[in-house]
Amino acid sequence: MRVLDASMALAWLFPRKDAAEVALAEQALDELDYEEFLVPSIWYGEVANAILRGERKGLVTASQTAAFLAELDLADIETEADSPKLRQSVVLALARVHSLTAYDATYLELALRRGAPLATFDQKLAEATREAGGRVFGDRP
């Protein structure tokens, strides 16, 4: 199992410039065939918002977006079942300790609670994950 943040998934639509990041995004995409990816409920809004920004900037078309979303629908991406309300105090504490947004701390909390690596390109979130004792997808053991 992996916790997937929006930045990693969006790299499948908006390719990264760094070769190592491109390879990591491709590895995560390949793992969708046999590995479960877990997301918090906020993931869908974050992905939709980034897609809209990309469309408005002319980086992607609505038809490219539709194809991307159809592929995501086929992927083994599960939404965390617990209510965000149950985790709010932990998310706030993690956000305060690591100077994260509540959104990013939501991913961190989920990865720590599930003991799963966090797949992210957000360097601040990745560092907070390591500091909190979690694992980041792509890090060597």
Q: What are the language-model segments listed below?
A:
Residues 1, 80, 108-141:
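Acidic, PIN/NYN-like endoribonuclease modules and their adjacent C-terminal/linker elements
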Residues 1-42, 54-66, 132:
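Short, well-structured N-terminal submotif of metal-dependent ribonuclease cores
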Residues 8-9, 43, 86, 107, ...:
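Alpha-helix capping/helix-boundary segments
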Residues 41-44, 64-97, 109:
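Acidic catalytic patch
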